[in-house]
Amino acid sequence: MKASSQTAVPCLLMRGGTSKGPFYKAADLPSDKALRDKVLLAAMGSPDKRQIDGLGGAHPLTSKVGIVSQSTVPGVALDFLFAQLQPDNDTVDTTPNCGNMLAAVVPFALETGMLQVQGDQTTFRVLTLNTNMQCDITVDTTGGMVQYEGNARIDGAPGTSAPVVINFLDTAGSVCSGLLPTGKVRDTLTVTGQGFAPFTLDVTCIDNGMPLVMFKASDVGRTGYESVADMNADAELKTKIEALRLQVSVLMGLGDVSQKNYPKMTLIAAPQNGGALSTRSFIPHVCHDAIGVLAAVTVGTACVLEGSVCDGIAVMPTGAAKNVSVEHPTGEFSVALQTEPAPHLPGGQNVTQAALLRTARLLMRGEAMVPASLWSGPAA
């Protein structure tokens, strides 16, 4: 659909968890991937660190896009493709998942008529096309409509909202070859690079929904309790972390990740506020104000594995059902894990289920405008 010299692309601007961005129906975007990415970049105002000419919020957490379509997979209602854009470059990365944006998928589908309300609670299965991961998402639809007001609170988003419950069905090896892509619970590496002396540290490379490299903050000369501002201003630390990321990614089978936004890098320390573990996560070059959904699931999983870098630091509940509170700079993120003994596996435990609570909200409905010279819209 055109408006003057621009093409209007229908979308809903939505907050999903602690992220936000425009959501589109796949049919309203170009079918050609390269052209689609150019349209998304134009709509978001990238590349420009302020994203002044688009919808982006000048931060990786507000430079995200959701693309939704009806699924053809039996038993699955929706296909969801997540796209991570960056304010200051022209990359559109659809490799990793985003559990925060995932929270807004079913509300989007209900708001746009792709799905119908089932009752006071509505549950649909969603397939993430990024990694072929499936999950069941339940939203509050009391009164026959999506409810956004409620009493659920998540750290990193202001106020309270109606709950969105996400049950992940199979998250191990979302991008990597498996849960432990190096085949070990713990690896010892010596990191070299320009601008710092070589250093040796232990890492846990793990992917239970998001590829992470976890290591003790003390191994890079930090406490793990620094503020986000201090972390982002620490040029020496960021140089070391990036050198580690590029080096360890080869061991993880990810190859050259210099232009990728994974793996994420997570510094850990003993909990301070009654949780299981304290974290500071780089995504990968900016310190996260909180922690990503699937990163929290992956951190929680590492906490239950014997011999991981979390072993001896994390404070864990007993029993097969574990509620793991992952502390982050603005609060905590609780992940409900179901585990079973697995002596044949590295780490001795198998995580059979991961569930978590998020919230979402429709912020605006309308059309994103892109130059007609770039794309004239879907064929009639």
What would you call each of these model-derived segments?
Residues 1-380:
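A glycine-rich beta-to-alpha transition motif near the start of alpha/beta enzyme domains, typified by
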